[in-house]
Regions:
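Walker A/P-loop nucleotide-binding motif
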Residues: 47-64
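Conserved AAA+ ATPase "sensor/coupling" helix adjacent to the nucleotide-binding pocket
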Residues: 161-177
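Short conserved motifs of the RecA-like P-loop NTPase core
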Residues: 177-189
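The conserved phosphate-sensing helix
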Residues: 190-202
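A short, basic N-terminal segment
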Residues: 1-40, 44-46
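Short regulatory helix/loop adjacent to the ATP-binding pocket of P-loop NTPases
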Residues: 133-148
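Conserved P-loop NTPase "ATPase switch" module shared by AAA+ and STAND
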Residues: 88-108, 114, 121-130
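Conserved AAA+ ATPase "SRH/arginine-finger" region at the nucleotide-binding site
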Residues: 150-162
Length: 204
């Protein structure tokens, strides 16, 4: 580690800001399908108006969504509980719905109207959520049918290479620089999950 104990304490007590720079987006077999889709814009299939990227917390969904936001000048919403059809009708730019959670009770008829408006207006929508949206406990059959037409892309659990890159990035976000041996040591001993990576970084 290249910081002493005192400076480390000061940094950890300071509110750090996550960055969503393209250069810090690490393509890997775990996430390359999602990243390839974002990189291929605007050469998306005509019928690919709504895309959902899903995976566990910390898997980089927000990073990918924010890269696309900058690329297409999209409007991003954290959840949709406060939205109305008026919002959708009035916005002519691509949309992002962030962090749809599987155990939340969503207004299904309103969602169905949202999705129909996106398609009929030839707009684009990117959704991020914690699980495959087809596994949500939807009741409205028309909504289920509509969701089944989405491009649904999973971000898988990290492999060893991605774990090390995420560790380096998260420490860097906190203005900490650790040597390669220490990163290697951590990566070989933690659970293969994004949550475990976040927990280790928070502890250190």
């Amino acid at each position: 580690m290249t910081v002493n104990d005192n400076s480390k304490q000061e940094i950890l007590n300071f509110h750090y800001k996550k960055n969503f720079l393209y250069k810090d987006l690490y393509k890997n077999p775990c996430n390359e399908i999602a990243i390839n889709l974002i990189e291929s814009w605007p050469k998306w299939p005509v019928d690919n108006r709504i895309t959902c990227i899903y995976g566990p917390s910390g898997s980089g969904k927000s990073h990918i969504a924010n890269i696309w936001k900058e690329k297409v000048d999209a409007v991003i919403y954290e959840g949709i509980s406060h939205l109305t059809l008026g919002h959708i009708y009035s916005i002519k730019r691509p949309l992002i719905f962030e962090n749809l959670i599987s155990n939340h009770k969503w207004p299904e008829e309103l969602l169905f109207e949202f999705f129909n408006e996106i398609k009929s207006s030839n707009n684009y929508l990117l959704i991020t959520c914690n699980d495959n949206p087809l596994k949500f406990r939807w009741k409205l059959k028309d909504l289920i049918s509509r969701i089944s037409s989405f491009t649904n892309i999973e971000i898988k659990l990290p492999d060893d290479e991605l774990i090390k890159k995420i560790l380096v990035k998260q420490f860097s976000d906190r203005q900490l620089s650790l040597d390669k041996q220490f990163i290697e040591y951590i990566s070989q001993r933690i659970e293969r999950s994004y949550l475990a990576i976040n927990n280790v970084v928070d502890i250190i």
